[in-house]
Amino acid sequence: MTYALLVLEPPGQRSTRTEAEGHEVYGRMVQFSEELKRRGLLTISQSLKTGSTDARVKVRADSSVMITDGPFTEVKEVIGGFFLLTCETREQALAIARECPAAQWATIEVRELGPCFA
């Protein structure tokens, strides 16, 4: 089964770290990804930029398009990154989420991938 681990962070959290702290945190996440890859569980992982490059696109029934540029100050959490995993069970995905270094400063949301009609 394929699972996404979404790293949900408070907006602006990264800017509270010193440069050294940011490098240390990022290094721990890279090591975690490399270990998952070594175990044959990781398809891809990536951190996401937040802020001025964000955008939301909405297409309405009348084909009108609305594009809203970020940052989105009204949000309570931002997706700071993700891991796409192949796991035997949901329990395995949850165990991996508990191992994730980001669980110490963010929320890790575990979502199984599948068709949207199921």
Predicted region positions:
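Conserved, structured core segments of small domains
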Residues: 1-118
